[in-house]
Structures are given as C-alpha cells and as structure tokens.
Amino acid sequence: MATIKVTQVKSAIGRLPKHRATITGLGLRRINHTVELEDTPAVRGMVNKVHYMVKVEG
C-alpha cells in the first residue's frame, strides 16, 4: 500500500484537545518529527483535521 510522510511543523500547545489527540494519534511527538503512515481514508481524515499543523509529502 502507498505511504505518506507527515511532519509536524507547528506546536500543539494551546490547540483544541481534539486536535492535540489527533496529532498524538498520528504518532507525532514534537515539531519537525516525521512519521511514515499508510495512505488510508482514516489517516487522510486525521491529516485534514490538523492540516494547519502538519506538512504532508508523498
């Protein structure tokens, strides 16, 4: 299956609790942390929810 790289580019401090939980659910821990995830509708939905805090490649 195809994969995408998701990088956190903004802090989760002061954000909505649901958005902080989404960042954690994506496996991101700190700014400039990158994870490689499967390109599924569920992951895409999570990325769309916090699009202003992450950068997506691939």
Swiss-Prot record:
Entry-linked SUPFAM superfamilies: Ribosomal protein L30p/L7e
Listed InterPro entries: Ribo_uL30_ferredoxin-like_sf, Ribosomal_uL30_bac-type, Ribosomal_uL30_CS, Ribosomal_uL30_ferredoxin-like
Keyword match Repeat: no
GO molecular function terms listed in the Swiss-Prot or TrEMBL record: structural constituent of ribosome
GO cellular component, one term: cytosolic large ribosomal subunit
SUBUNIT field: Part of the 50S ribosomal subunit.
Protein name: Large ribosomal subunit protein uL30
Gene, per the UniProt record: rpmD
